[in-house]
Amino acid sequence: MLDLGLSKMALIGVVALVVLGPERLPRVARTAGALFGRAQRYINDVKSEVSREIELDALRTMKTDFESAARNVETTIHDNLREHEKELNDTWHSAVGGLNEGSVDAGTYGSDTPAAPSWRGSTAALARKRRNWRVKQAAMPVWYKRATTRRTHVQSGAARVARHQPASLRRPTRFL
């Protein structure tokens, strides 16, 4: 910062003593020290803020790089998956080529639209699953129902312990 040696500081002190006098010098020195301390704290705050912003900027760039790499990997995987799915569907349709055209979905074979995967199943099975959704909802375990339902009878911990404590361990009740 400033190159102030011991000799320069002594010279400044002597000049201040001559100019200000011995009665005002301590007050001015305290004020100057407080201002100097504030300036140092302000400079340190600015430095830390700048370094924090630089780190945040670096983290943001790393985040965008990571997201773009993840997106690239995802698109590559989806492209490879679509390619292999198309090959499998073409192989399947060539192996089942002896069947009549009524047995093959019109939208999956021989059209320009993307082929629906043959492994997804028929719509009849889907309709059956939709119809029986209530059966699955009713099979909730009792312990889960007890743990997640809203409590209507709330007790404190002490009351719960007293309720489940055997009579032989309870303290006798005395009124007088």
From Swiss-Prot:
It is found in: Cell inner membrane. The keyword Transport applies. Residues 155-176 are annotated as: Disordered. It is a single-pass membrane protein. Keywords: Cell inner membrane, Cell membrane, Membrane, Protein transport, Translocation, Transmembrane, Transmembrane helix, Transport. It comes from the Bacteria. InterPro entries: TatA/B/E, TatB. The chain crosses the membrane at residues 1-21. The Tat system comprises two distinct complexes: a TatABC complex, containing multiple copies of TatA, TatB and TatC subunits, and a separate TatA complex, containing only TatA subunits. Substrates initially bind to the TatABC complex, which probably triggers association of the separate TatA complex to form the active translocon. Part of the twin-arginine translocation (Tat) system that transports large folded proteins containing a characteristic twin-arginine motif in their signal peptide across membranes. Together with TatC, TatB is part of a receptor directly interacting with Tat signal peptides. TatB may form an oligomeric binding site that transiently accommodates folded Tat precursor proteins before their translocation. This is Sec-independent protein translocase protein TatB. It comes from Burkholderia ambifaria (strain ATCC BAA-244 / DSM 16087 / CCUG 44356 / LMG 19182 / AMMD) (Burkholderia cepacia (strain AMMD)). The lineage of its organism: Bacteria, Pseudomonadati, Pseudomonadota, Betaproteobacteria, Burkholderiales. The gene is tatB.
